[in-house]
Regions:
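Predominantly five- to eight-bladed beta-propeller fold
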Residues: 2-44, 51-113, 161-169, 173-183, ...
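A short beta-strand motif characteristic of beta-propeller blades
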Residues: 30-32, 113-118, 197-200, 242-246, ...
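Residue-level detector of Asp-centered blade-edge/turn motifs that repeat once per structural unit
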Residues: 47-48, 132, 218-220, 257-260, ...
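Non-catalytic accessory segments flanking enzyme active sites
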Residues: 53-57, 62-65, 91-93, 124-127, ...
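Short, solvent-exposed loop/turn segments at conserved positions within beta-propeller repeat blades
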Residues: 86-90, 143-148, 228-235, 272-282, ...
Length: 359
């Protein structure tokens, strides 16, 4: 902040100084991500716990709003950064942290790498996912949310620790102190940890709907993405770029992805998916499975699908191994319900992983 000749502060220089200092947050989602994109996480562990992706953002470019507490008139108004139309958003960055462990498995430090993408063209970090055995995935969008990119983040090789026990160093008690060194691999240009490559790009002249749970890898490495299919008037899913979910079954959320199927929350559009084409389980109450009902279904990659909830209502599900948990309520129910289900073989034992039909 500088004083002018008449003794007043130069507002332009004051703003520049404030912007340079910034209002940085680490490990949190910026306001636009949480409020508009349903992304509330700001850091993501790798499945093997050897890496961490974390967000940092500078909110100093956003407008400041002052919010009072109507229940407590004596309390001063609180300042909050708030993104507004036609003004700057938070400046979002992503960092890949490689974690180092000694020979006893104790953490001793890490190496940080900036995750690189075209942040000027794609300023929204809409989604992050990390599937075991695969690189992390990012979904980034432009300001108008008419274009997006699905990116894979290169993580490189894990830090290698080499122990050197006979070093002559001792602590204050005279005990020998183990020392070690780390081997940092060399990478070709463009393959360094934190670099990204584009897997898919999508465009829509109107608007690209976000579908929670996408993008995602199947365990065997196929890429599942959202598709706003304007020709079919349906929000669909693709696997390696090919749409496989039915016309008229609007995918609202992906709950789980396996090599055999995806578990989804869907809404049916009757004009596009008539009652005659519905599975037997929904035939008796087909008229109620429409945009009012959020149903859980399993959809295979060949397009076959089956409903996993029968009563129209608001439903979701989680599954792991041989079990699943269904939660929600029907349209006539005031209270939430929870059902635990287990896939069991005819002999009463839990089904094997390669015997998912329970026979």
């Amino acid at each position: 902040v500088a004083d002018t000749q008449d003794g007043t502060q130069d507002d332009a220089q004051s703003d520049a100084a404030e912007s340079q200092a910034g209002e940085w947050k680490i490990g949190l989602a910026e306001f636009a991500a949480g409020e508009e994109m349903d992304r509330y996480d700001g850091f993501w562990w790798s499945p093997d716990s050897k890496y961490v992706l974390f967000e940092t953002f500078d909110a100093s470019h956003e407008q400041t709003w002052y919010i009072a507490d109507p229940a407590d008139p004596t309390k001063p108004a609180q300042a909050r950064r708030y993104p507004q139309a036609m003004t700057a958003n938070a400046d979002v960055h992503l960092t890949l942290l490689e974690l180092g462990y000694d020979t006893d498995g104790c953490y001793y430090g890490g190496i940080a790498h900036n995750v690189e993408w075209d942040r000027e063209s794609y300023e929204y970090l809409a989604a992050v996912s990390w599937t075991e055995g695969h690189e992390p995935l990012l979904l980034v969008q432009d300001r108008l949310q008419q274009h997006d990119q699905v990116l894979a983040v290169h993580v490189g090789e894990p830090i290698v620790t080499m122990s050197a026990p006979e070093n002559g160093f001792t602590d204050e008690d005279g005990s020998e102190v183990e020392t070690f060194s780390i081997a940092i691999p060399e990478y070709a240009p463009g393959e360094e940890p934190g670099t990204t490559r584009v897997l898919e790009e999508h465009s829509n002249d109107c608007w690209l709907d976000l579908i929670a749970g996408t993008p995602a890898y199947t365990p065997d490495g196929r890429l599942v993405c959202a598709m706003n299919d304007m020709d079919a008037d349906t929000n669909r899913l693709t696997v390696d770029g090919t749409p496989f979910t039915p016309k008229g079954l609007q995918v609202r959320e992906v709950l789980d992805v396996t090599d055999d199927d995806v578990l989804c929350v869907v809404q049916r559009t009757p004009e596009l998916l008539p009652a005659a084409d519905l599975p037997f389980l929904w035939q008796s109450n087909a008229d109620d499975h429409d945009a009012r009902s959020f149903d859980v279904v399993s959809i295979r990659y060949d397009g076959d699908w089956e409903p996993l909830t029968y009563v129209p209502g608001q439903w979701t599900m989680s599954r792991a191994g041989d079990g699943c948990v269904v939660t929600g309520r029907g349209m006539d129910d005031a209270a939430m319900q929870m059902q635990h289900c287990m896939n069991v073989r005819a002999d009463g034992a839990a089904a094997d992983a390669d015997d998912a039909d329970g026979n």
